[in-house]
Amino acid sequence: MKNRYIASFEAAQIAEKQIPQFRSGDTVRIGVEIKEGEKKRIQTFEGIIIGRSGNGVDATFTIRKLGANSIGVERIFPLYSESLKSFEVIRRGRVRRAKLNFLRGLKGKAARIKELKR
């Protein structure tokens, strides 16, 4: 059980940040603040959510994208990080798994995910 002061601090952190609903299989575009020396810039990273883990302030999610020459790039982000500046869900994916680790072995058209129809 957490200390009540820590719990209230974490609740304030969560309430402060507005993050849209997303699941595994969704394609998202996030803006991450990068510090290079004294300069700051926002770098966008677009890919498929292959998993979420944790809960509360400690929650993280993993994004995978295919870069140049079909090389996969994965990044793990804390959900309530100060460096996340924007979060946009581009399309909803229709998947039946919580963790999409099988995508790591697939390339090209085999790595596509069907779009969820509403």
From Swiss-Prot:
HAMAP family: Ribosomal_bL19
InterPro entries per the UniProt record, alphabetical: Ribosomal_bL19, Ribosomal_bL19_sf, Translation_prot_SH3-like_sf
Record's keyword annotation contains Manganese: no
Protein role: This protein is located at the 30S-50S ribosomal subunit interface and may play a role in the structure and function of the aminoacyl-tRNA binding site.
Name of the molecule in the record: Large ribosomal subunit protein bL19
Record keywords, A-Z: Ribonucleoprotein, Ribosomal protein
Source organism per UniProt: Aliarcobacter butzleri (strain RM4018) (Arcobacter butzleri)
Keyword Aminoacyl-tRNA synthetase: no
Gene3D superfamilies referenced in this protein's UniProt entry, alphabetically: 2.30.30.790
NCBIfam families documented for this protein: rplS_bact
Matching Pfam families: Ribosomal_L19 (PF01245)
GO biological process: translation
Record's GO cellular component terms: cytosolic large ribosomal subunit
GO molecular function, a single term: structural constituent of ribosome
Entry similarity comment: Belongs to the bacterial ribosomal protein bL19 family.
PANTHER family on file: LARGE RIBOSOMAL SUBUNIT PROTEIN BL19M, RIBOSOMAL PROTEIN L19
Top-rank taxon, per record: Bacteria
